[in-house]
């Protein structure tokens, strides 16, 4: 069984199952699994704060707990929520296109797991989500 990172201890059960799936079934490295967790934790912190703006300031974005996220809340995620999240990442967190693209990939994989692999969700709300364009640099 894949070793669970202490980073993941404050996640909700569905996310814990997904991270276990990535490590044991998909064979992802512990570091890769941790990166998925960090990407998804940031999204669900944003998701909660977007529903309750007071959370952005009190106790602070980095302190928002996600251990109480439910399947119903996950099912309520819309493509518009994710577009707003991408804007938040670019404007407030100063994430470049490559970082945002990785977060899109994490979200896609998570929602595919919930719809295709487990059948917990009937519809994938981010199926039409596009990956941010990454500028190609010229060779040096």
Question: Where do the protein language model's features map onto the residues?
Answer:
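A detector for short, charged/polar N-terminal pre-domain segments
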Residues: 6-10
């Amino acid at each position: 069984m894949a070793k669970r990172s202490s980073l993941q201890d404050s996640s909700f059960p569905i996310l814990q199952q997904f991270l276990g799936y990535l490590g044991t079934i998909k064979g992802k490295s512990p570091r890769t699994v941790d990166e998925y967790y960090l990407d998804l934790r940031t999204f669900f912190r944003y998701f909660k704060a977007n529903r309750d703006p007071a959370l952005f300031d009190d106790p602070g974005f980095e302190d928002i707990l996600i251990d109480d996220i439910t399947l119903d809340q996950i099912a309520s995620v819309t493509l518009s929520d994710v577009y707003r999240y991408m804007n938040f990442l670019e404007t407030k967190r100063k994430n470049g296109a490559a970082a945002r693209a990785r977060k899109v990939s994490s979200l896609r994989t998570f929602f595919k797991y919930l719809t295709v692999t487990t059948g917990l969700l009937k519809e994938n709300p981010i199926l039409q989500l596009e990956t941010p364009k990454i500028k190609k640099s010229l060779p040096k």
